[in-house]
Amino acid sequence: MALTIDKKAIQPINTLPLITRSYNLLQDYLAISKFKVVAMLVLTAWVGLALAPDVGRGMGVQFISLLGIGLLSAAAAVINHVVDSEIDSKMARTRHRPVAKGRLSKAHALSFAAIIGVAGFIMLMLWANTLTAILTLFALVGYAFVYTSFLKRATPQNIVIGGLAGAMPPLLGWVSETGQMAAAPWLLVMIIFTWTPPHFWALAIARKSDYARAKIPMLPVTHGIDFSKTCVVAYSVLLAIVCIFPYLIGMSGLIYLIGASGLNAVFIYKAIKLKLAANDDTAMDLFRFSIIHLMVLFIILFIDKWLLL
């Protein structure tokens, strides 16, 4: 008797080589972890650590402390992807994200968040101190749950209020080194806190229709683009003022003052340019520059510290 095979009964299998599937999974993990954003947060935490009084901790211990902060920050980003997956699927900028696209299930993503979050917390408990671990956990809860689950959907001031969680890394870096709270690192927190609204409002101006479609009450959606442009200029000026304070209290020297002044002059110029000629190009130009601004500002802080000027 001839053997017959029902071709319809044959289930398709993944023919991609294992190395390709592993690479794709790694790319998805990096995407839901917001690797580039977390790298920026770790940079600011590192500068906070570097500016703290030297207590003789080794570089290896400092590295593990920063890694712990980074892993908890990445866990918060993953939770954000899960909570926002339905919103992300409605927005052109985010609809190809792994969870929104269905490449990773919510359960898979949350399991990944739990693993890296627990690992980061243990690192901070063992190689930093309890205060750093608790503060970093609070920052995770603030971003992943208070901001993402509530504030983002509730008020046009979502970025202003929720920005505190994302501004914490310099304080976390400082506390990981000293084990104590201090006034000085709060100035660095205030810089990021003040930087956050114009950074995100510039993006929201360029992507207003996306946010409106997803029913996210960003400022340009609820109050209009013209009012939002005015707020961007106002916060840009406020940012320039806040950035002077590390120099005024002796936390930094002339290199920082000159560098910060130049960066903020460009920031204000681009904000005014957006105010006078608002379109997607000017909005995205400010958004992209704001990322460079924050990164270079903190690098200058570090250089200034170690040149002792």
UniProtKB/Swiss-Prot annotation:
<feature type="transmembrane region" description="Helical">
    <location>
        <begin position="59"/>
        <end position="79"/>
    </location>
</feature>
<comment type="function">
    <text>Converts heme B (protoheme IX) to heme O by substitution of the vinyl group on carbon 2 of heme B porphyrin ring with a hydroxyethyl farnesyl side group.</text>
</comment>
<feature type="transmembrane region" description="Helical">
    <location>
        <begin position="186"/>
        <end position="206"/>
    </location>
</feature>
<feature type="transmembrane region" description="Helical">
    <location>
        <begin position="131"/>
        <end position="151"/>
    </location>
</feature>
<comment type="similarity">
    <text>Belongs to the UbiA prenyltransferase family. Protoheme IX farnesyltransferase subfamily.</text>
</comment>
<keyword id="KW-0812">Transmembrane</keyword>
<dbReference type="GO" id="GO:0008495">
    <property type="term" value="F:protoheme IX farnesyltransferase activity"/>
</dbReference>
<feature type="transmembrane region" description="Helical">
    <location>
        <begin position="238"/>
        <end position="258"/>
    </location>
</feature>
<keyword id="KW-0997">Cell inner membrane</keyword>
<keyword id="KW-1133">Transmembrane helix</keyword>
<dbReference type="GO" id="GO:0048034">
    <property type="term" value="P:heme O biosynthetic process"/>
</dbReference>
<dbReference type="InterPro" id="IPR030470">
    <property type="entry name" value="UbiA_prenylTrfase_CS"/>
</dbReference>
<dbReference type="InterPro" id="IPR006369">
    <property type="entry name" value="Protohaem_IX_farnesylTrfase"/>
</dbReference>
<keyword id="KW-0472">Membrane</keyword>
<dbReference type="InterPro" id="IPR000537">
    <property type="entry name" value="UbiA_prenyltransferase"/>
</dbReference>
<keyword id="KW-0350">Heme biosynthesis</keyword>
<feature type="transmembrane region" description="Helical">
    <location>
        <begin position="159"/>
        <end position="179"/>
    </location>
</feature>
<dbReference type="Pfam" id="PF01040">
    <property type="entry name" value="UbiA"/>
</dbReference>
<keyword id="KW-0808">Transferase</keyword>
<protein>
    <recommendedName>
        <fullName>Protoheme IX farnesyltransferase 2</fullName>
        <ecNumber>2.5.1.141</ecNumber>
    </recommendedName>
</protein>
<feature type="transmembrane region" description="Helical">
    <location>
        <begin position="107"/>
        <end position="127"/>
    </location>
</feature>
<dbReference type="InterPro" id="IPR044878">
    <property type="entry name" value="UbiA_sf"/>
</dbReference>
<feature type="transmembrane region" description="Helical">
    <location>
        <begin position="289"/>
        <end position="309"/>
    </location>
</feature>
<feature type="transmembrane region" description="Helical">
    <location>
        <begin position="35"/>
        <end position="55"/>
    </location>
</feature>
<keyword id="KW-1003">Cell membrane</keyword>
<comment type="pathway">
    <text>Porphyrin-containing compound metabolism; heme O biosynthesis; heme O from protoheme: step 1/1.</text>
</comment>
<dbReference type="GO" id="GO:0005886">
    <property type="term" value="C:plasma membrane"/>
</dbReference>
